[in-house]
């Protein structure tokens, strides 16, 4: 079994990280202890590509694009290429990431894609009684359409996000 997590927030010494990064680190290391291969792919804080092994977890941090207005496109393209390269070497069974993570990634046959609902754009727009940003809303809906399954951090997040799936 090989699981690939998508996050830009995997803890890195000297850089802040939040709940997403802590969650992925905790579950990734536990999965490794159960002999499950784990890769983490995300964008780097530094302007370089980096790959390292941390407690059995392969962490790949990709240099961020600086192309104004199209960084999202080039970043997604590079993440997709990285996933494809990993999959050719060690087939991935599951790719898991937060709400927006699948929007512009090409799907690879035989991989299951899962979205982990932590509270995405639609969720917080509703909770804060504000409008949906069209671009973020578009990305989230596109991402949701690509998912084979969803998991949520709570029943509250699940029930309030379900209407947007």
Q: Which residues are covered by each model-predicted region?
A:
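N-terminal subdomain of nucleotide-sugar transferases
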Residues: 1-47, 55
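Active-site proximal beta-strand in glycosyltransferases
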Residues: 3, 94-97, 107-126, 151
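Alpha-helix capping/helix-boundary segments
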Residues: 46, 101-102, 156-158
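Conserved nucleotide-sugar phosphate-binding/catalytic loop shared by glycosyltransferases and other
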Residues: 48-69
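Nucleotide-sugar donor phosphate/pyrophosphate-binding loop at the beta->alpha transition
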Residues: 77-78, 123-142, 146
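Short N-terminal targeting/anchoring amphipathic segment
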Residues: 83-102
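A short, active-site helix/loop in glycosyltransferases that binds the activated sugar's phosphate group
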Residues: 143-165
């Amino acid at each position: 079994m090989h699981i690939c997590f998508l996050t830009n927030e995997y803890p890195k010494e000297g850089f802040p990280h939040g709940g997403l990064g802590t969650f992925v680190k905790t579950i990734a290391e536990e999965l490794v202890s159960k002999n499950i291969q784990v890769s983490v792919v995300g964008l780097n804080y530094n302007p370089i590509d980096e790959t390292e092994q941390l407690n059995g977890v392969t962490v790949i941090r990709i240099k961020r694009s600086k192309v104004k207005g199209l960084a999202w496109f080039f970043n997604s393209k590079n993440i997709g290429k990285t996933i494809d390269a990993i999959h050719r070497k060690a087939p991935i069974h599951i790719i898991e990431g937060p709400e927006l993570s699948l929007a512009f990634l090409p799907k690879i046959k035989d991989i299951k894609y899962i979205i982990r609902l932590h509270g995405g754009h639609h969720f917080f727009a509703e909770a804060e009684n504000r409008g949906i940003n069209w671009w973020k809303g578009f990305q989230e809906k596109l991402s949701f359409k690509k998912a084979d399954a969803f998991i949520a951090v709570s029943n509250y997040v699940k029930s309030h996000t379900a209407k947007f799936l």
